[in-house]
Amino acid sequence: MKRQSPQLMAIAGAMVLAMAGLMGLPSQASAKTHDVKMTALEVEIVTEGTGKKYKAWTFNGQMPGPAVRVTEGDTVNFTLENPKTNIFQHSMDFHAAEIDFLKNYRAIKPGETISFTFVAKKPGVFFYHCGAAPMIQHVARGMFGAIIVDPKDPKVWPKADREFLLVQSELWNNPDDVEAMFGRKFDHVIFNGGIWKYHPFFIGAEALEAKPNERVRIYFVNAGPNEFSSLHPIGEIWDNVYESGNPANKLTGVQTYVVGPGSAATFDVVSESPGVYPIVTHSLTSALRGAIAALTITPVAKDAPLMPLTPWNP
């Protein structure tokens, strides 16, 4: 057999890489590596909307935990620290990862650290949470958050003019009442850790604003731990809904979309007329306990961070 020259092999390799780029295939050159570290903190925080102190279990002292954002094909090196000052075991479960549960998602004791690596293979918006027992209590007390995996090809869906991240969860006034958690006897349902956090009629509420005809993209995660969310934009219709935030899972012209506990979706809406458009879960027992976020459409909408998720700090 005739051997190929090193020059020909190099040219062939370059052509393969070039074709991969043209086809939008991930390559080691384009993919990035992210070192993500979180600390499990058992802290007393002040509940937004009530002013009451709450004994929370958190990632990095905030509820929800920090938002993680990567691109499809990226590698995530994750480390969780459980400080000696804590009392309970904690763990991490990333719904965006495809790795061994027993090895990587095991609970660690106070004073221990665990690390694992995964590749974000699928685009979307995903839930992450502590899985230590009793998991229902760890989630209810604040150990949850969101990871967004952007598609490697941004042209697979329309470009958003504004992006917001909303994480829905249930809140119990007594975080030690596990029986009430199993009985679904929650006191509030909240967005991003606050009761009526984005309701314009409450003093101190934060604003979700956009200009007419801007495409607003909402990354939505339902942390639960128990209740389904039936997300609806009052006065509007979702232009597009993407199950699990994956551009391949596209629905058009949706009035209300159900997101179960531990699941997520991405919602696009383009509003032509100025006004206020409340975003609610149409499970009214949940909406009327705090899960209402008003989207204000105004020509003078202020510029906002990409994801205006204000930490719920101790």
Placement of each model-derived feature along the sequence:
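N-terminal, post-signal-peptide metal-ligating segments of extracellular/periplasmic oxidoreductases
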Residues: 20-105, 110-115, 149, 181-220, ...
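Short, surface-exposed ligand- or partner-binding patches at beta-edge/loop junctions that are enriched
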Residues: 91-92, 124-134, 272-286
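A contiguous, surface-exposed recognition patch within enzymatic or periplasmic domains that forms
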Residues: 159-230, 234, 272, 277
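A cross-kingdom feature marking solvent-exposed beta-strand/loop segments within repeated
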Residues: 100-104, 247-267
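N-terminal secretory signal peptides that target proteins for export/translocation
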Residues: 1-7
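Extracytoplasmic/periplasmic copper-protein system
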Residues: 33, 42, 140-175, 180, ...
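Bacterial N-terminal signal peptides
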Residues: 10-24
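Short tyrosine-centred short linear motifs in exposed loops/low-complexity segments
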Residues: 73-74, 120-126, 213-214, 263-265, ...
